[in-house]
A protein has these predicted regions:
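Acidic/glycine-enriched connector segments
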Residues: 1-120
């Protein structure tokens, strides 16, 4: 089967949700995508995760994973559910200022498809 990842601006209006859902349904039904990798940096990532959570009830064969850019600290553990996350091997040695870029490179290498939200 195939994998998909997401990249987009931090700010994302709720009006994007129906189109995102439509695109994801097409990827699942027409292109056999069953694995999704999501970041956690902004509204687009949160929206993608939310839509995937809904779609997993309709399409139980799909899975989604939040890909962490850094290991969680004590404060993160108090507010974040890490049950659906992974931390790619090798990122622990990456300087913090490069962590998101390296995580994104890892996600891109895993993906057959990329869904984006860009406003420029």
């Amino acid at each position: 089967m195939s994998a998909c990842t997401f990249f987009g601006h931090r700010d994302c209006p709720e009006a994007v949700r129906p189109k995102l859902r439509e695109v994801l349904v097409e990827l699942i039904e027409r292109h056999g995508v069953d694995r999704f990798y999501v970041g956690r940096q902004g509204a687009f990532d949160a929206m993608a995760r939310s839509v995937l959570r809904e779609l997993a009830e309709v399409y139980p064969h799909i899975s989604y994973t939040v890909v962490l850019e850094r290991l969680p600290g004590p404060m993160d553990k108090a507010v974040w559910d890490f049950s659906d996350t992974i931390f790619p091997e090798g990122l622990e040695a990456v300087p913090p200022r490069f962590a998101i870029s390296r995580r994104n490179e890892w996600m891109l290498k895993q993906a057959d498809f990329v869904v984006t939200y860009v406003t420029h």
